[in-house]
C-alpha cells in the first residue's frame, strides 16, 4: 500500500496557485481514477483506490503546508505505511523551471517548510518526493 500526499494550503485564496501544486496533482489523480472520498481523518482528506495493481491512499492535509507533518505521520501510522518505501509526497519547488519535475528518494528539506515538518514528524529524510513546477494558466489542470 502507498500513501500519496499532495502538499498545499487550504482556502480559496490559495486555489490555482503554484504553492498548491501538490493538492492539484492529488485532485487530478482523484478525478482520473474516480476515487471515492474516504472522508476526513487526522486533519486530512483522503480516498483509497487501486493504481497499477497497488492499493493507494491519496491524501491532502487540511493543515497549512508548514504543519503537514502531523497529519502525514498520523495517517502513515494508522495505515501502517513505511515512509521509507511506501510514502510519496508531491509539492511545488520554486527552484524548478515551469514544466519541470524532479524526483528524489531522500534528502534534506531544501528550504521547504512543509517537507521540513514531515521530516521532523517522521524522524527520517528517507521518503520519495516528487517536486513539480507548472505554469499556472486556465489550462493548468491539463498539464498535470
Regions inferred by a protein language model and the residue ranges of each:
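Nucleotide and nucleotide-moiety/phosphate-recognizing core
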Residues: 2-105, 116, 120, 124-131
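Phosphate- and other anionic-substrate recognition elements at nucleic-acid/protein interfaces
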Residues: 109
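Single conserved hydrophobic/aromatic residue that forms the stacking wall/gate
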Residues: 136-144
